[in-house]
Amino acid sequence: MALTQERKNELIAEFKTHETDTGSPEVQVAILTEQINTLNDHLRTHKKDHHSRRGLLKMVGQRRNLLTYLRNKDVTRYRNLVDKLGLRR
């Protein structure tokens, strides 16, 4: 259920804005999206896992805040990220 280090490194390499980038909003949103998708699949089979559902809602809220920050700061980066991840916005 947790994101492996290899997959996290792949996401960082794909969405980084410069060579040593690990904490830009793009990277954080990409990692959160991957975790949200994994947790969503888990909750489809385990419908009564309310602890994980609460964690999912917290992650979705955190991603929403990061996307709002990015949209206010730089609209083109925001649009590129949403298109690349296939998010509804």
From Swiss-Prot:
Pfam family name, one: Ribosomal_S15
InterPro entries (UniProt xref): Ribosomal_uS15, Ribosomal_uS15_bac-type, uS15_NS1_RNA-bd_sf
GO terms for cellular component: cytosolic small ribosomal subunit
Superkingdom of this protein's organism: Bacteria
Keyword annotations from UniProtKB, A to Z: Ribonucleoprotein, Ribosomal protein, RNA-binding, rRNA-binding
One Gene Ontology term from the biological process aspect of the record: translation
GO MF assignments: rRNA binding; structural constituent of ribosome
UniProt keyword RNA-binding present: yes
Signal peptide: none
Spans traversing the lipid bilayer: none
Family (UniProt): Belongs to the universal ribosomal protein uS15 family.
Function statement: One of the primary rRNA binding proteins, it binds directly to 16S rRNA where it helps nucleate assembly of the platform of the 30S subunit by binding and bridging several RNA helices of the 16S rRNA. Forms an intersubunit bridge (bridge B4) with the 23S rRNA of the 50S subunit in the ribosome.
HAMAP family, A to Z: Ribosomal_uS15_B
NCBIfam families named among the record's database cross-references: S15_bact
Subunit structure: Part of the 30S ribosomal subunit. Forms a bridge to the 50S subunit in the 70S ribosome, contacting the 23S rRNA.
Protein name according to UniProt: Small ribosomal subunit protein uS15
UniProt source species: Shouchella clausii (strain KSM-K16) (Alkalihalobacillus clausii)
